[in-house]
Amino acid sequence: MPDPLLPLLPSPQDADRPWLVCYGIDERVELTGHVLSMWLAKIAGFVTSESTPGDGVHVGLPPHWRSVAWACGTWLAGRSVLLGSSTHIHAAGLLPELSVAFAPESLVEEAEAQALVPPASLALRWPGELPALVLDGAADLMHYPDRFTPVSTTADSVCLRDLAAEGAAPAAPGTTAATVPSGERPTTLTRAQLVARVETAGASTGAGNRSASRAVLVRSPDTAQMLQEVLVAWRAGRTAVVLTPEADDDVAAAAIRQEGITA
């Protein structure tokens, strides 16, 4: 069975519209599908070059355009994404092949490779000196090609392990964020299961409604929930407008107004 996840991801041909917009405090970043696909390709190249397949790539990042890029780039490389803190990782007895985070203390020290990513949306390198043996999760990506041939994997391959599954916060009033279907949220999903959940969430929220606005607000403190909502938006041909955890109600209102989000 072919990989059902890859068709949801942007490709170099998707240059006609923004796929992802990220709002933070005094920050707005817009990425077309073409530009985003280049980031995914570089990340996939980095992942496959710097690590060998293990228990997964630890993406220790909060909701942000970079966490979307690292998760999707990991999937492009045929690997699984691990979400949660180093404590969660240790408790589960897992050994990531790569750990990526915004802060040194959030890295999993036992990972085969580690990379620090600058939290500033437009930064192209880590600000300051890197700890010993830790890679720059922005500058070091620039050495990799803008295109990447997806690593062949199957629909039943695990793609997401959410070790911090504690239930996602409800969507903000006035948004069309796709929520996780009722019931306890699973901590492990195959590629087929993730796509099925995206399809179910999209159907339950009317994400493909032709009268809906071209963009959808994604506001969740939970990275796993944020990733699902982004995929729901993309599957419906809409722009995912992600708010970072620091973005307050004023930023949300500005994003809704500027991006023309209505429903």
Label the predicted regions.
Residues 17, 34-59, 76-79, 88-89, ...:
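ANL superfamily AMP-binding
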Residues 61-64, 218-223, 240:
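Conserved AMP-binding
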Residues 73-77, 224-240:
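Conserved short alpha-helical elements in the N-terminal third of ANL/AMP-binding
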